[in-house]
Amino acid sequence: MAADVPPKATLTQKAGAIAYRIFCAILRILDIKVVAIFGRVIGYLVWAFMPGRRKIVARNMRIVVDPTLRGRKLSALVRRNMVRTTMNMACTFKTGIMTEKELQKSVTLIGSESFEEMAANGQTVIGCIPHAGNWEILARIRPLFPKVKRYGSMYRRLDNPVLEDIVYKSRTKFGCEMFSSKKGLKEVFRLAKEGGMLGVLSDQFTQQGVFIPYFGKVTGTTPLPALIYKRCRGNGHLIAANTRNTGLGKWDAVLSNQIKISDSSADSLAAITMEVNNALEAAQRESIIDGFWMHHRWKATREFATNIDDEQKEQIRKYCKLPYRIIICVPEEFEEAILTIPFMRELRACRPDIQLNIVCPEEQQAFWKTQDYVGHAVTTNKPLQQLESDELYKDGPYDMLFMISENGKVFRELQALLPLYITGFDDSPLRKGIRAKCVRPIGDTPEHKINDYLALASEHITLTKQPYVDSSKGNQSATNRYIAPFSSLGTADCWQTEKWKELVSRLEGGVQLLALEADKEKATSLAAELGIPCVLTKPETAAEVLGPQCTLYAVDGLLPQLAALVGCRCHVIMSSRLAAVYAPPGDGHKVVYRHSPCHPCYRNSCDQASPCNADISVDDLL
């Protein structure tokens, strides 16, 4: 506490402390109403000249009031809140130096009698305080409760040691003990044991807290009130203590909102903290404009799913109303984009409130809409307009953007959505706009492309080994054998027609030709030449014809990747892409890989006299 030897102050810090003393001297001679008017004027200036803060408040208003707010109605709420908040903040400085007479004129206590009874006779009251109104009042009203043995509050020490000493003395002058979180919790727990009142600002974001809903959206919440309550061993009471503005220079200090903890919740930190959040939310809803919404209460941090245990997940499932919204802008090549599936499944599994919003080329959209881990899928054609449509807007603000695509135009549109955290690869041409840059894994031998995306996920969450293959999604009764002679990668990956004829003859009947509808004309012609049925499918319907009991003989491309997705066994010829990097994921596949010195070439058409796979025989494939 202040009794400790403070670090030596710098010249700048000393100057700041002198300026603060002068400021307080001026405040002493001003009436609280004058300070409030001055605060409102400053509030209008803050609103007018700080667009960044306006955006933060607008985001928070959509969370605490209505996620569908937009336009003039949202702007009006933002203005009112910024003006009110600045007024309240200005008045907190005056509150610390007000006389008892001035305080009595400005503050009305609600529930003070029951509050004092609870805090007397060895009982402990933990006052859970939101950042709302003029919360400095709660430190000043200590003399009004003579029966309370000890009266204290948690606070964050200032970096300026001179200013810290001044503020500390002003806060303790009237008998309120101040406990710094930097000094540990020993004195706090001693107060809890001896009895009294302890105030804790309970609505601050903390990465080390429990991740549970507040106003229906998950955020890191301090479990300190719950910890202190449990330490009281039955002699503790939790209340939501808040202040709200009722007029120019006037506030109510509400001390009557007791938080009842059920027997089923008493042993769970997450459950007790959830009850605290619910009570604070109810208290703040009585005057939502008084809330301090000019900071990011619902932050998106690099690690957004750390140590979320089953108790927290239970509270999330029970109380979450607004999801944690992740935008994933996938690669434009379908064959590459589909390899992000394990990455997506990892993200979706890390927290119950995760919502994945996929931004993709139009030809991919229908496929992503069929995936149960995907919330919404929009196209790269005006994605901002789609993501802000009424259907998607109602789920609240976006939190995080994984920019995997290298489409700069799309990236600029997505930045306009103001995601709080943007992440991607360090070798992306868009890396200047990416906050968290992941280095692709580099080993002694080439690694599968899936591992790149899992490495990106591991930068933010703990991986749980989510698979690429989900055989339950395929056609369980299908036992067909298919050939897939057309590659979505281009003619460089095609195999000679004579060899397909030989393969069909050696498979001895029951073989069908499988192709994407984009290759309909070529597929029907070749199927007629081979004398076998032709089955056409789309990426989004491939699971209807393929299943874990099917076998596919194919050239590299999208179809073998779709087949592997549902557990179909694949025999694949690869030439323009490295097999170690792009082979169909899963077990039981056979890959035959050939390349000449000029390859892998990644060309749509081969410019060589003889393609790489020309020497692959039917025996090799079988």
Predicted ranges, named:
Residues 107-112, 252-260, 440-441:
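Short amphipathic
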Residues 61, 229, 288, 347, ...:
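Residue-level signal for inorganic ion chemistry
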Residues 2-3, 11, 49, 79, ...:
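Non-catalytic C-terminal accessory region of glycerolipid acyltransferases
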Residues 121-182, 207-210:
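Catalytic core of membrane glycerolipid acyltransferases/transacylases, capturing the structured
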Residues 105-109, 160, 178-182, 218-219, ...:
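A conditional alpha-helix N-cap/helix-loop micro-motif detector
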Residues 53, 70-72, 82, 120-121, ...:
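Catalytic machinery of carbohydrate-active enzymes
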Residues 2-129, 169, 306-318:
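Membrane-anchoring hydrophobic helices of lipid-metabolizing enzymes
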